[in-house]
Amino acid sequence: MAVSKITLHYAQTTGGSNEAAAAFPWNTPKKAVNPYLDPAEFAPESALSNLIALYAVDNEQEQLRRETLSDEVWERYFFNESRDPVQREMEQDRLISHAKTAREQQRFNPDLVIIANVGAQPAHISKPLLERIKYFHSLGRAKAYSRYLQKTIRPCLERLERVRDSQVSASFRFMASHDGLEGLLVLPEMNQDQVKRLSTLVAAHMSMCLDAACGDLFVSDDVKPEEIRQAWERVAAEAMRLEVIPPAFEQLRRKKRRRKPVPYELIPPSLARMLCADWWYRKLWQMRCEWREEQLRAVCLVNKKASPYVSYEAVIHKREQRRKSLEFFRSHELINEDGDTLDMEDVVNASNSNPAHRRNEMMACVKGLELIAEMRGDCAVFYTITCPSRFHATLNNGRPNPKWTSATVRQSSDYLVDTFAAFRKAMHKAGLRWYGVRVAEPHHDGTVHWHLLCFMRKKDRRSITALLRKFAIREDREELGANTGPRFKPELINPRKGTPTSYIAKYISKNIDGRGLAKEISKETGRSLRDSAEHVSAWASLHRVQQFRFFGIPGRQAYRELRLLAGQAARVQGERKAGAPVLDNPRLDAVLAAADAGCFATYIMKQGGVLVPRKHHLVRTAYELNDEPSAYGDHGIRIYGIWSPIAEGKICTHAVKWKKVRKAVDVQEAAADQGACAPWTRGNNCPPVENLNKSGGDLPDIKTMNEKELQDYLHNMGQKERRELTARLRLVKPKRKTVYKQNISEQQRLQLEAELTARGFEGSASEIDLLLRGGSIPSGAGLRIFYRNHRLQEDDKWRQ
């Protein structure tokens, strides 16, 4: 008890065991050595220590590089599935397992099969379809999404396979089996460069066929024309296997009852074309574009819900083609033997190639027919003829048409042409006659339908209408029932409601340039008729459809030549008396005067009237052979002028020979005028003002005036100067507000992104933000895309 008290007292006195232990010097705790916590313990730096550290780092990096290189070499040359059987077996097992898993998922979810099939298609098919599938998936409606895949996408893929089978025939596949011609099987997927290479290979194959035919047939030096024709037949047979009609095939082919001798002189130019790579490029590129367009029609990418009349790809290609043509016209000029020059762009714009001139001429012709009908007491009837449903690829709601038989746009046009030819033959046999104009235009899916403005005797109207209805509905009659309106629709024009010219004016304008139809909305597509004019023009160019055709009247080419002759005579005679005759024959001069005045009614009557055979017309177009041969050795036919059976000789309207040459451009002048837009050279492309300042010249003196002086200046301006100033002010685009931005929902944003992607843009967030802030994106040919009123629009005047 006493010891415990002493121990407790000692512990309380010394402050515990730790304090008691630290009281002795030999038991004092020592500080741990930690260079990270105590920088003072670091060894002093020296040049040697730094050099050693750098060497250590270099050695470490070199070791890592060697190890990496060793691993890459091992994996590339040894450890891969092609050399290591174990690795190859493991890779095969992995792929098989992945395929089984995907197959199992597709068995329980058939939608994945459809998506996989879409992804396996070429880019021009899969990209727009996947964008639409992505859009439907983003809506969050599972049943609607699955229904869209099953009811729309799967039938589209089935139709696509049928279209491909119809495009590639057995003979076409046989040609593709030759060495180097395998690309024929994927012709719709090629671009222009690939088609050019393929056309070179096809031309080489034709050359080898000709060499083989010559070796088999030409056994002696004395070659007969019939042997040359047999060699041509072999090369032509090879071309026919590619679905291409050889040149001069109708004149050179074998016929049982040939009335005229065989034109052997057509064989050399025909062979020259079939051995030319450029000729094959034009044929194959046309075939590629048509096949590609039909495939897009098969998957419902050409309709009013996607792209009306024709695909966006074809529209963009047409814009680019028009832009290149315009650049070509601007860079060339025409020159004659005397050295006179004409700007090629001005010549083209002054010709009938100008849409405005073409529209004005057709409207004047229709007006002339209207005046003649009033004079004769004829009635006017407006007919609409449509193809059967088997020619229509898409329904009105944008879904696949189950009755479509993979018929092409060209086949629908040929159907209407054949129907009209059969009707015309029956009409002439019945003693019925008519005259008028026919307009061919597309449905929203590209199928052709016709509008006819016909003038006839009132007593023949019912007979002609009944006969035309009989031929228009004779095929697939059971699908119409009692209502024949979807296939054939006649409408008697009431003069109280409008004239025949007013009926046809809209159809002529919307199929050329859409003049005056900016506010007219198409009932079929829901878009402005002026905006649809570009699609219609691209559709007619791609499918080679003749849009306008007049019948029962004299030719319009003679009308143009007479107007040209009248202008030439006015320039030669100078100050001649008004109404003075130009031609010696009064009857011919009367026809020329009517054409010069632009009165089609008088011109037609002076030519002999309507419903008169061509052999009885007074003035006709004269043709002649070209003086210089073409690149293929033949002399083409060109217009010489006019001729008449009641007068001797021909009248030449193209006496001056013009040649096409490239304009001479001064590079220094172009650089000084255009600044940074000039071609890249060693000179400085600064703006002209900066160049002037650097060269020591004086800056241009810009006159300023106060408000009173400005008012006086504007008050003293003439009417012409005011118009010019107003026109310049209209060209100034207003500044866009920086804070302006349209507010749209997420669904509208997704729809905008899908539309941009369908038109060939990226549809990125930056593009969408630019459009929402009031900006625009160039789409080619001077047009721009902008977003206004929650709708994507395209125009060349988007600011106005």
UniProtKB/Swiss-Prot annotation:
| Active site positions, chain numbering | 503 (o-(5'-phospho-dna)-tyrosine intermediate), 507 (o-(5'-phospho-dna)-tyrosine intermediate)
Q: Does the keyword Hydrolase apply?
A: yes
Instruction: Give the UniProt keywords, A-Z.
Output: DNA replication, Endonuclease, Hydrolase, Nuclease
Could you say which enzyme class this protein belongs to?
Answer: hydrolase
Q: List the EC numbers from the record.
A: 3.1.-.-
Q: Which GO terms describe its biological process?
A: DNA replication
Domain of life, per lineage? Bacteria
GO MF term (any one): endonuclease activity
Q: Which family does it belong to?
A: Belongs to the phage GPA family.
Q: What role is this protein assigned?
A: Possible endonuclease which induces a single-strand cut and initiates DNA replication.
> This chain belongs to which protein, by name?
Probable replication endonuclease from prophage-like region
Q: Which organism is it from?
A: Salmonella paratyphi A (strain ATCC 9150 / SARB42)
